[in-house]
Amino acid sequence: MKYAIMSDVHANPVALETALADARALGCEKFAMLGDVTGYGYDPKRALSLVRENFDIVLMGNHDSACLGLEQRQCDLNNPNYDLDRKCRGELSDDDAKWLRGLRPLRTVAGMALAHGDFTEPKEWYYINKPAVAAANFGARKEKLLFCGHTHRAEVWSLSREKIISRPSDRRLKDVPNAPETIEFKREKGARYIVNVGSVGYPRHDLCMSYAICDPSSGVFAIRRLPFDFGSYAMSMVSHGVDLPAWLLFLLFSD
């Protein structure tokens, strides 16, 4: 059974539709969403609708939690990262709010561990971004394959039989693709992996949308990368009255 594992849509339904069509064309049969359907983007209601219609497994992310008013420690400090979540909170239907409240930040599916952020304390939304942090996360779980999002950067951490941590994605995910590409990783005997699937709808670091493809019964998993139309995205933001973030303005108007 081939899974498409996506994360961080961030209220960008057009990007999500693109990723879904791509995954289906590649033969994916099951769909997992690792959270952050809301936040940052221009149409959270449409994004929520698409996720509810198309995904078999859905996790809660920190922005989904903030949309429900559950991240009070951060929202009460007027963190600008949660501005659109506070706005979305008043626009959610009762049914959508109830559905969101039923989501969890961590699940195990087909022998794979899935989380939005990290696996040590899933509700604290920590980033897996350093070898020591990756080591702690490997220690928190027993599964051979762990998938997460949250950082908006696709990458792969590995733990060998000799307990050596490396990041085999460093060179292979370096360049921004001009066309769709699939980067396959062969699982080595006795090794374990943390796979960050990147972001579908808000790729502020990778500058391309990405998601993971995995058949748990095989010895291969992959990062699928697609070009991202930043110009159209910016126009959608403006037409919905959403301020463009500084990183996007810099990207659009720098030489």
Where are the predicted features?
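Active-site environment of divalent metal-dependent phosphoester hydrolases
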Residues: 10-15, 39-41, 63-68, 120-122, ...
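Active-site neighborhood of phospho(di)ester-bond hydrolases with catalytic His/Asp-centered motifs
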Residues: 6-7, 31-36, 57-62, 115, ...
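Short beta-strand scaffold segments in enzyme catalytic cores
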Residues: 106-108, 154-158, 210-214
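Active-site neighborhood of divalent metal-dependent phosphoester bond hydrolases
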Residues: 47-48, 54-142
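Acidic, His/Gly-rich catalytic cores of divalent-metal-dependent hydrolytic chemistry
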Residues: 161-255
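N-terminal active-site segment of His-dependent metallophosphoesterases
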Residues: 1-56
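Beta-strand-turn-beta hairpins that frame and shape the catalytic cleft
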Residues: 1-4, 107-114, 187-194
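Hydrophobic, aromatic-enriched interface-forming segments
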Residues: 138-168
